[in-house]
């Protein structure tokens, strides 16, 4: 499952609608019992329906003076959905917040409806199985993942002209 369609009703944040839509598409969604959802290409509906999609809503408004972060946990699955597990954002951080979608300042608002569909990675990368990805800077290549050159002494090795 991944968010495929985003209907933005209000976006007064500094981020463009397309940027937020792209971020939403990459948020991992729970796919437990995803077999209850059929592929949209196999469905008889026009665009989406209850059989081939899950509807999520997001409404966040910053009323205080502090910067407000909008998290994946703020995405709410349609309460009328029979299977409540499918489509919920996967939240693995200890605080239980999930991925940051955007930040809002006082008076800014984000209101949208998201449609999550079942798909395969051959169609789009958002349907690829994901896991946590880490990055650590290794300036001296001590882990020896590659046989790249690294500088011993920048002052001696680089020409100053």
Regions found by a protein language model. Name each.
Residues 1-161:
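Protein-protein interaction/assembly regions in multi-subunit complexes
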